[in-house]
């Protein structure tokens, strides 16, 4: 039993509470000797729990994590066609730089694959910063990669090369959803569907997603809270095979943390230009609050975030038995969880009570109430539980 009582929390605050550990900021030392190669350097990078390293030793360490993630699981076959997602975030630029470096090495060390770069334009208003100038700078720096752009919500045939792209106004379904939580979840699923369609269009067999440990920890908690527990393992795993057309999504930066990403940005003088989700953290949604919670943990208790993230590696993905045949959600492509279960029935029962209200008291018919709950559970049987929750927030129109 816990021996800490209320008296232990006096005017001095939580005396026995967990104390903040190492921050994620790290230290850049102006000059000194590298603890790994022994050479003098004008700038040393001091990561938490690692000795100070010179510019080249740090880059070798970070790039090894990228190569090790792909090599340990043998997830990327030789001469694979890869679609790399660049959204302007720091981690996406790090992944782009690492992949370009791996492709420009000698034959022995070269990563043997062909890469194309995709940017999904999700600007909701013309007043937002135009990403095209920054993308053109990246195209020149990382030649000969081909850069493609497509608008979120557009048809796949509207995919354009960066040099030929011009934005147009589209009618967005997410504006028809009542809550910000539902809108953000829908945009995430819509984005995944579009990525899979573009990969098929460009004949790419693999997609590189720039997710790091802290973002995957936030995604794990968010998926559980949204009712996606059956597919949470694939949401944070190195390999996700739910995209259409047997396209495989890979997360080769999953072992990098925020501190390593920021040091890499500084070392390579990269310029992130994304300001979308991170700027919305003041708006209340389940995703934003979870991200803020994990960011605070990462700042004060970095090892706790690692524990949350590593939990995802121990969760097995829920799969349909082979004899039952494939049965996936029409929106998120996860295995359907809409079978009759006590938990889902209880949720729909509660909703039915709220809907019937006074009529329930007048009729006093519990059988009708349970029948109503079963009908709700069996309706939209092509959607999983979480995607049905999105549909419930839809004011008009259709999700798909």
Swiss-Prot record:
The keyword tRNA processing applies. Pfam families: CTU2. It is found in: Cytoplasm. The keyword tRNA processing applies. One of its GO terms (cellular component) is cytosol. Pathway: tRNA modification; 5-methoxycarbonylmethyl-2-thiouridine-tRNA biosynthesis. Gene3D superfamilies: HUPs (3.40.50.620). GO terms for biological process: protein urmylation; tRNA thio-modification; tRNA wobble position uridine thiolation; tRNA wobble uridine modification. GO terms for molecular function: nucleotidyltransferase activity; sulfurtransferase activity; tRNA binding. Keywords: Cytoplasm, tRNA processing. InterPro entries: CTU2 (IPR019407), Rossmann-like_a/b/a_fold (IPR014729). It comes from the Eukaryota. Belongs to the CTU2/NCS2 family. Plays a central role in 2-thiolation of mcm(5)S(2)U at tRNA wobble positions of tRNA(Lys), tRNA(Glu) and tRNA(Gln). May act by forming a heterodimer with NCS6/CTU1 that ligates sulfur from thiocarboxylated URM1 onto the uridine of tRNAs at wobble position. This is Cytoplasmic tRNA 2-thiolation protein 2. The lineage of its organism: Eukaryota, Metazoa, Ecdysozoa, Arthropoda, Hexapoda.
